[in-house]
Amino acid sequence: ADIGMNIAGPAYNFGYNTGDAGGHSRVESGTAGAAAGSYSYIDANGDRRTVHYTAGPDGFKASGDIGVDRRTAAAAAALAALAPKAPVAAAPVAPVAPVVPGAWGYWGAPHVYSAVYPGLAGYAAHW
């Protein structure tokens, strides 16, 4: 199959408009690796947002209503101001304790006397 054989093929034009029912529209035209167009929609506040764009060797560039609208940004800022603030916590401080060295063992004579292993004494006697 020759899928995608003519991606940058001849010029094209297309568009659609859903009318008042959906509030969406789009128009695009392009040729040989470049495209230009626009789309629009009705946002949650009931405002029509329109974005114009171009795409080509320089990449994708959009202009128009590409950010958050002012009413939504203002409402979000008002809600953020009402949010409870976290209390400032003091930095944890490690308790200061004296350094006590561990007990050192005495590695001298054994606590219990034991005779030398007789086999070793007998072996040494044969030299």
Curated annotation (Swiss-Prot):
Keywords: Cuticle. The keyword ATP-binding does not apply. Disulfide bonds: none annotated. It comes from the Eukaryota. Residues 9-87 form the Chitin-binding type R&R domain. GO terms for molecular function: structural constituent of chitin-based larval cuticle. One of its GO terms (cellular component) is chitin-based extracellular matrix. Component of the rigid cuticle of the spider. This is Adult-specific rigid cuticular protein 12.6.
